[in-house]
Amino acid sequence: MYIMKLLIKEALEDALLKLNISRKVILTDAKDFGDFSSNIAMVLQKDLGKNPLEIAQMIVEKINKEKFLIEKIEIVKPGFINFFLDHKFYVYLLEKFSKNDFLIELEKTYTYNLEYVSANPTGFLHIGHARGAAIGDTLANILEFANNKVIREYYVNDAGNQISILAYALYIRYQQILGNKTLNLPEDSYHGEDIKYFAKIFHKKYQEKFKNVDYSLEVENFFKDEGVKIALEKIKLDLKTFRVEFDLYTSEKSIYPLIEKSLKKLKNTYEQDGALWLKTTDYGDDKDRVLIKNDGTYTYFAPDLAYHYVKKTRSENVDYLIDFFGADHIGYVKRMQIALEQFGFSKDTLNVLILEMVKLRKNGTEFVMSKRKGTAISLEDLIELIGVDNARFFLVDHSSSSKLDLEIDLIAEKNLSNGAFIIQYAYARTNSILEKTKVTLDVKLIRKPFDDKFEMKLVNVLKEFPILIEKIAENFKIHLLSQYLITLAKSFNSFYSNSKIIDSEEELKLILLVKATQAVLKKGLDLLKVEAPERI
């Protein structure tokens, strides 16, 4: 937690100032050897020409422990200074937590553009999209919680060949509803229930207006527009049910007029064989990339580059772009990052999180996802099978780059083998305790430290919360949050099982601990967008 580090840094800097020493102080987590540790004495060895242990002793003697809420300081070989915070600091910390002030304070905040899900508007969202939605939305929540500005964006791929396939599939299914049995879908079309659903929506809206109408270019374009509109409405509806909403939906078609202007901003393009190329091999790519083919058409790379240029240069003043790619697109990452450098952006402008496959199992059977064959497990199906809470939790409970097997039968069970339930159960238990207590929380009356091993373990887990949030805001590893909440819930349950709280001599202190735990569990569940039930 930044404020904890700041406190110890100030204590060290104050001591160094008294010794007329000017040096940058770096702290590390001490884990089992205190709250924080510093190697400043070893850093100063050469400058002062003294033994690090002697230097450490000089520094420690100048530290005002009471002022900086330090309980004790230990010096260990070869010269580390380990700091243990006073119990007054923990009372202060827990009181802040209990009032929903989690002391999140990054040294610097940024504006992020997160583009996630971005499924083609050609069918229902499936479980793979659900993983991207849960991870992207949770990361956006955490970044915002850490005081960053976040733009949530969905890129609507409405300009490719897949939209032509969608339009014709919609046309055929619509004609079949009207009784035309002579028309059949091509093998490479979309054969799923989603197209039948879209056709019913289309038929409800237009009745027999297009009955037996030839599939002309004009009709094709109409079915393209309507197909995308219907699919996108369904996508938005399912995402809302999944507690995911976006700030922007950007059409790929809207980017096309901006491609030529955007490509002119690239530094290292050249023409060869009638095509326009981007020189990427000089920056580590295995080959240069074609932007405009010799027939004048764009490669898929060109609109993608233009779109990223637009995102970076719009009025939001975005510092960083975060994309979510399927594992099958991992080779695309490097060339995108190289290309963005050619626009003059910094190397770390684009961050890409890889989303591995999700497999769903029920009764020992694996479902194979293929939208065109109609065997995909949709987001709607997933929610119906295990509920929004379980889906949101288990889709973010592992690293995004690891393959994920979801056992529906196990996840749906409400017991202590279910991580989401463990957290919700602990939260409900905190509510039960706080409903029973009659004490008025006045932290000034707390005199004794948290010295019981179950109390101290819970305090140590709680204090990690803001540190964890700050860490996730930097490394984007959101699975650490769900794992942390499980650890917190288990620590609380151990504390509860081994402590008399209500009517105990130390009830005031323990109620503060319960209240802080309740607040952290609630905030963690809110970030995951998993419900926090008052009772179970």
Curated annotation (Swiss-Prot):
Q: Give the catalysed reaction(s), semicolon-separated.
A: tRNA(Arg) + L-arginine + ATP = L-arginyl-tRNA(Arg) + AMP + diphosphate
- GO MF term list: arginine-tRNA ligase activity; ATP binding
Q: Where is this motif: 'HIGH' region?
A: 119-129
Keyword set, alphabetical order: Aminoacyl-tRNA synthetase, ATP-binding, Cytoplasm, Ligase, Nucleotide-binding, Protein biosynthesis
Q: Which GO terms describe its cellular component?
A: cytoplasm
Task: Give the chief site where it resides.
Answer: cytoplasm
Superkingdom of the source species = Bacteria
Q: Which NCBIfam families does the record match to this protein?
A: argS (TIGR00456)
> What's this protein's family per the entry?
Belongs to the class-I aminoacyl-tRNA synthetase family.
PROSITE patterns associated with the record: AA_TRNA_LIGASE_I (PS00178)
* Description of how the protein assembles with itself and partners: Monomer.
Q: Which InterPro entries match?
A: aa-tRNA-synth_I_CS, Arg-tRNA-ligase, Arg-tRNA-synth_N, Arg-tRNA-synth_N_sf, ArgRS_core, DALR_anticod-bd, Rossmann-like_a/b/a_fold, tRNAsynth_Ia_anticodon-bd
What protein is this chain from?
A: Arginine--tRNA ligase
Matching Pfam families:
Arg_tRNA_synt_N, DALR_1, tRNA-synt_1d
Q: Cite the Gene3D superfamilies for this sequence.
A: Arginyl tRNA synthetase N-terminal domain, HUPs, Isoleucyl-tRNA Synthetase, Domain 1
Q: Where in the cell is it found?
A: Cytoplasm
Example GO biological process = arginyl-tRNA aminoacylation
EC identifiers of the protein:
6.1.1.19
Enzyme class (EC, first level): ligase
